[in-house]
Swiss-Prot record:
InterPro entries: DUF905, YkfF-like_sf
Family: Belongs to the UPF0401 family.
One Pfam family here: DUF905
Domain of life: Bacteria
Gene (name only): ykfF
Protein name as it appears in the record: UPF0401 protein YkfF
SUPFAM superfamilies membership: YcfA/nrd intein domain (SSF54786)
Segments forming a coiled coil: none
């Protein structure tokens, strides 16, 4: 079984977000303002499931919940 790539429970860095977007095909970095940005989780139809700004106090905790349940790994997306 492949280990999940998750975020820290609070705010997260661009490097941490990029690790997630590289691992999951349905999670993207959006509204990039340079120092801050949103990470967005979408379902298989492309509809937004959850999003959070990287600086929010509980950003990672909320996103991790949806990464676990809705994240589509890039290594399985082509199977």
């Amino acid at each position: 079984m492949t280990q999940s790539v998750l975020l820290p429970p609070g705010p997260f860095t661009r490097r941490q977000a990029q690790a997630v977007t590289t691992t999951y095909s349905n999670i993207t970095l959006e509204d990039d303002q340079g120092s801050h940005f949103r990470l967005v989780v979408r379902d298989t139809e492309g509809r937004m499931v959850w999003r959070a700004w990287n600086f929010e106090p509980d950003a990672g905790e909320g996103l991790n919940r949806y990464i676990r349940t809705s994240g589509i790994r890039t290594d399985t997306a082509t199977r």
